[in-house]
Amino acid sequence: MRAAAAGGGVRTAALALLLGALHWAPARCEEYDYYGWQAEPLHGRSYSKPPQCLDIPADLPLCHTVGYKRMRLPNLLEHESLAEVKQQASSWLPLLAKRCHSDTQVFLCSLFAPVCLDRPIYPCRSLCEAVRAGCAPLMEAYGFPWPEMLHCHKFPLDNDLCIAVQFGHLPATAPPVTKICAQCEMEHSADGLMEQMCSSDFVVKMRIKEIKIENGDRKLIGAQKKKKLLKPGPLKRKDTKRLVLHMKNGAGCPCPQLDSLAGSFLVMGRKVDGQLLLMAVYRWDKKNKEMKFAVKFMFSYPCSLYYPFFYGAAEPH
């Protein structure tokens, strides 16, 4: 029995059909013996409280608009309290905002805020694979692999009781447009800039001598002089002597900030396996009050306890 949405319906209607299909399923465990897939044991963890259902609160923005109102705890990621769910789920809001796949919210919320039924309903493997195909390249651009907790082999095949792809098969309403490189999408507020600085290992004001294309990436090669380390982080002397930043998957997408290399740039990045990965780049504008404020007060900003996937994922600081 596959949970699938009515093609071409609006988001709420599609999920209503999905949940309607699931609600009639019997709750007795023996009636599920037909389905060959079984959820992996959750690390042998025992829960202090029995499963409960509660309203999805407004301050859980990742899932508050997912299309159903009640969620089950513990969830499918072993979170037992709503406070823990809120903290961990907030890390994924930026990924949702990137719109890397139309089913990102459905997939994530099936784990963080599973629909309230008598038995946990997992996402289908095909749903996981579809979202991973759309979002993993974006995450990799920032040096984050697809996380272990979301490995698709953990989820059931589509012939089992599971949540299938909802919106990924809808026809496109407009011709595809080449997206700006993820690292070149700009924040315009001081808070947004400081969030980016929080999630970056280093922040540098620099000039760019040249850009090279290599294996699908762009390489930004810094000029020898005119570098100012605003947040040195893990950068060593050898890193700064010849500063080379890798823009992952950046060879085939536009980056308006880099159309001209004249002037200085504000760059942010992470050091991963000895390589400097670009996370964000801005043209330096001394008249930009938001940028000046962010640079001046970056160390006063209350950074999240968790690194994000470009400003949110459950990687400890």
Curated annotation (Swiss-Prot):
Domain NTR span(s) in chain numbering: 181-303
Cysteine disulfide links: C53-C116, C63-C109, C100-C135, C124-C162, C128-C152, C181-C253, C184-C255, C198-C303
Domain FZ positions: 48-165
Keywords: Developmental protein, Differentiation, Disulfide bond, Secreted, Signal, Wnt signaling pathway
The keyword Signal belongs to this UniProt entry's keyword annotation: yes
Gene Ontology biological process terms from the UniProt entry: anatomical structure morphogenesis; apoptotic process; canonical Wnt signaling pathway; cell differentiation; digestive tract morphogenesis; establishment or maintenance of cell polarity; negative regulation of canonical Wnt signaling pathway; negative regulation of cell population proliferation
Record's signal peptide: 1-29
GO cellular component: extracellular space
Role this protein plays: Soluble frizzled-related proteins (sFRPS) function as modulators of Wnt signaling through direct interaction with Wnts. They have a role in regulating cell growth and differentiation in specific cell types. SFRP5 may be involved in determining the polarity of photoreceptor, and perhaps, other cells in the retina.
Free-text domain note: The FZ domain is involved in binding with Wnt ligands.
Entry protein name: Secreted frizzled-related protein 5
The species this protein was found in: Homo sapiens (Human)
Top-level taxonomy: Eukaryota, Metazoa, Chordata, Craniata, Vertebrata
Gene that this polypeptide is encoded by: SFRP5
